[in-house]
Design a protein with these regions (language model features):
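Pre-Walker A adenine-sensing motif
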Residues: 3-16
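Short alpha-helical segments that sit at the start of domains
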Residues: 264-293
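Walker A/P-loop nucleotide-binding motif
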Residues: 16-39
Length: 372
């Protein structure tokens, strides 16, 4: 976080007299990339406010409903200038409207694109039309020789492999300002987990020795050791299991069960964020694979089991074409594998383990509805 402060601090000293900064943040799953950038944004915006600098920090998760330049710019415009966001602009027009709004207001913008690699991989637009990297790193070309209202753009990704999908000209505009986030050590994980437990669990529901056990478990993983997301996922799943069993507190057995139901590449947090029909599509995939006992099943098979899952829950099923879109989305999220010739398979987990986790999440959602 100190490096981010150093990179952008001159803006606070000379607002309106600095050029746009492009920063890349890379790090493995659970290394704190998103949290660090988000926390920095809050502190930076707060510091600007104390200096009476009109700065707005926008943090966009590209995994949540962002599949194109249009969707991205509409989201940013809705946060910065909602009064003009609903008009029928194209993606290019929206970007220009955003910049003009910032110039005319006037105010400044610091934009963070989290999981930008996901957006680049899933973008529906043709490569020759350009992309977000091309657009956002060349804003200075709109008003040559002038300082920018967009203070900077922070691109967050797991690694630099997404650059292989960019044109050489786009890669060069990204520059060389890169922050690499290492994985956490056991002691660091323990401190983070304790802080989260104090917020998410009621007092006495989870003992310190269990927190320490989960921290050591995550730090000692053979794959991606020090994964904070994995550790938080274990605590979340442990809590869900304890809730489902109507237990008063989380025990080591709940943690062991949670560990047996966890797998690399898919987090319970990611699964819980899926909307109803995407979740049912995943349930249909697991049930089809379980029934046929084959490495792959067809989209047609998944759709049939998706329909049955809907009927069993008295939910109106969506169209076949819509489920195909959801399958593509699940594939890009790394939750399933969709092979054009072979079909659909589950990655990072056994079908049985995934089914158990999905059942736990469904039960948790039911309990939440009952409490409402």
């Amino acid at each position: 976080m100190r490096m981010l402060h150093d990179l952008f601090h001159d803006f606070l000293e000379k607002p309106g007299q600095t050029y746009q900064r492009i920063v890349q943040i890379f790090g493995p799953i659970g290394s704190g990339k998103s949290c660090t950038a988000y926390r920095f944004g809050i502190e930076f915006e707060k510091e600007a406010k104390t200096r009476k600098i009109p700065l707005e920090v926008v943090h966009v998760s590209c995994k949540v409903g962002i599949d194109s330049r249009y969707a991205l710019y509409q989201t940013v415009l809705q946060k910065v200038a909602p009064e003009i966001a609903s008009r029928g602009y194209s993606a290019n027009e929206m970007l220009r409207q955003l910049v003009n709004h910032l110039r005319n207001t006037p105010k400044y913008l610091l934009l963070t694109l989290d999981d930008v690699d996901y957006l680049i991989r899933t973008s529906k637009e043709k490569k020759e039309e350009g992309g977000v990297v091309f657009d956002l790193t060349r804003l200075n070309e709109m008003f040559l020789g002038e300082y920018q209202q967009v203070v900077g753009v922070i691109f967050i990704a797991r690694d630099s492999s997404f650059k292989k999908m960019l044109d050489p000209s786009e890669v060069s505009t990204l520059g060389n300002v890169v922050i690499k986030m290492p994985s956490y050590e056991s002691a660091q994980l323990k401190d983070i987990l304790k802080e989260r437990v104090d917020i998410a669990f009621r007092a006495g529901a989870l003992e310190d020795q269990i927190v320490e056990f989960v921290a050591e478990l995550s730090a000692g993983k053979s794959y991606n050791p020090g994964d904070c997301r994995f550790a938080l996922d274990i605590l979340l799943t442990s809590g869900l299991i304890a809730d489902a069993e109507l237990a008063d507190y989380v025990t080591i057995e709940h943690v062991r069960k949670a560990t047996s139901e966890s797998f690399d590449g898919i987090s319970t947090e990611d699964l819980m964020a899926l909307d109803e029909h995407v979740m049912l599509t995943l349930i249909g995939s697991a049930q089809a694979l379980s029934f046929y006992k084959t490495p792959y099943v067809s989209i047609k098979d998944v759709y049939e089991y998706y329909r049955m899952a809907c009927e069993g829950r008295e939910i109106q099923p969506l169209s076949y074409s819509k489920i195909k879109e959801y399958i593509k989305d699940l594939h890009f999220r790394g939750i399933i594998n969709h092979h054009p010739q072979k079909g659909i398979s589950i990655v990072g987990a056994s079908v049985e383990d995934l089914s158990r986790v999905l059942q736990t999440i469904e039960r948790s959602r039911e309990l939440d509805k009952e409490e409402e």
